[in-house]
Amino acid sequence: MAEAAVASTVTLPVSGGWTKHVTCRYFMHGLCKEGDNCRYSHDLTNSKPAAMICKFFQKGNCVFGERCRFDHCKPTKNEEFSSPQMLPPSSPSPSTDPESSQPAPRPKTQDWANAAEFVPGQPYCGRAESVKVEISIPLIEELDCDAAVDKEALRKQLCPYAAVGECRYGINCAYLHGDVCDMCGLQVLHPTDNSQRSQHTKACIEAHEKDMEISFAIQRSKDMMCGVCMEVVFEKANPSERRFGILSNCNHCYCLKCIRKWRSAKQFESKIIKSCPECRITSNFVIPSEYWVEDKEDKQKLIQKYKDGMGRKPCRYFDEGRGICPFGANCFYKHAFPDGRLEEAQPQRRQTGSSSRNRLSEMLLMLLAAGD
C-alpha cells in the first residue's frame, strides 16, 4: 500500500494537479465563474464532448434557435454507424442453420465487481471495460419519426406562455399561438377548434358579468353610512369591520359590529332588540355581507345563500341530540344526530294570551316612537 501511495504521488504533476487534465464542465457550457483561477482545464481542443450537441435540434424542435448554447449539428449516418460494433450482427438464413430460430442472447450488464478501483484524490477512471451498445438503424429511423410526430402534436397545442401574456419565442415557438380573445385580450382561441372557442367565450362572458356585478356592488356600497356609529362602512379604520349587517325586513344601513351589539343588549325585551333602531320593524336575523344589498330580489338571494351556508354547519346547542336548541325549528344550523338523521320539525305551539298582550304593547311602543 505504501508503494502504491508513493507511485500515485509520483505520477501527479507538480503544478495544477490532476484536475488540469479534466475539462471544466461549467466552461463547456459557458458558465464557469472562476475564469483563469479555475482548477480544471479550459482547453476544448481535445475534449469536445458529445453532450455539447443539442439533442432537441436533432429531433427538430429546439425552441432557442440561434440563441441555443449547444451545437446545432446533426451527425451523419456514416459517423453514427462507422464502428462495426455498433451495427447488429447479420442473421444467417433460417434454412441453412437449424439453431437460427433460437433468440439471440441479450447483452448482460457489466458486473459492478469489474469496476476500477477508486482511490481518494485521484480522478475516477470508470469501469475496467467499456460497455458495448448495439443500436439498429431502424431504431434511429423510428426515433426520427416519433420526433416528427411529437413536433406535429406540439403545433396543435396552444402555447401556455402566449395564453397568459406574451411568448418570448415568437414565431420560433414550437407551440401554436391562438387568436386574441376580444373579452380578455389573450391569445387563447384555437384557430380550428370551434368547441374550444365557444367554451372560452362563454367562460369569458360569465367572468365579465361577475366582475360587473362586483363593480356595481362596490359602487353601491362605497358611500353607505352606519346608522349607529355614523361612519362610512367602507372607510372604517379596521378592515375587519368593513362589513354590513343586513336586516331581513328593512333597508336601513348598519355595520355588522354595531347591529350585533344592539341586538345583544340584555336590558330590553327580545322583540325590542330584534327591531330596527330607526323604523322599529322586527327582523328575526341579521345577514353579514361584504357589500350593501337593498334590492328585494338581491336580498332574497343573499338570505337564501346565508341559510344554505348555515345549514351545513352543526348546531352547537343541539350537539347531535345531546342538548336542546333554544331556537327550535327557527334555527338555521344543522340539527343532525350522530348517525346522520335530521331532527324532525316540532309542531308550533299556539300563542297564549300573555304573548298577545306583549305584542300589543310592542305595537304601542312602535306607534309612540313613530309619533316622536
UniProtKB/Swiss-Prot annotation:
Coiled coil: none annotated. SUPFAM superfamilies: CCCH zinc finger (SSF90229), RING/U-box (SSF57850). Pathway: Protein modification; protein ubiquitination. It holds the Pfam family zf-CCCH_2. GO terms for biological process: protein polyubiquitination. Residues 181-208 are annotated as: Makorin-type Cys-His. Its EC number is 2.3.2.27. CDD domains: RING-HC_MKRN1_3 (cd16730). A zinc finger (RING-type) spans 226-280. Residues 78-110 are annotated as: Disordered. A zinc finger (C3H1-type) spans 20-45, 48-75, 153-180, 309-338. Residues 93-103 have a biased composition (Low complexity). InterPro entries: MKRN-like (IPR045072), Znf-CCCH_4 (IPR041367), Znf_CCCH (IPR000571), Znf_CCCH_sf (IPR036855), Znf_RING (IPR001841), Znf_RING/FYVE/PHD (IPR013083), Znf_RING_CS (IPR017907). The keyword Zinc-finger applies. Keywords: Metal-binding, Repeat, Transferase, Ubl conjugation pathway, Zinc, Zinc-finger. Gene3D superfamilies: Zinc finger, CCCH-type (4.10.1000.10), Zinc/RING finger domain, C3HC4 (zinc finger) (3.30.40.10). One of its GO terms (molecular function) is ubiquitin protein ligase activity. It is an enzyme of class 2 (transferase). It comes from the Eukaryota. SMART domains: RING (SM00184), ZnF_C3H1 (SM00356). It catalyses: S-ubiquitinyl-[E2 ubiquitin-conjugating enzyme]-L-cysteine + [acceptor protein]-L-lysine = [E2 ubiquitin-conjugating enzyme]-L-cysteine + N(6)-ubiquitinyl-[acceptor protein]-L-lysine. E3 ubiquitin ligase catalyzing the covalent attachment of ubiquitin moieties onto substrate proteins. This is Probable E3 ubiquitin-protein ligase makorin-1.
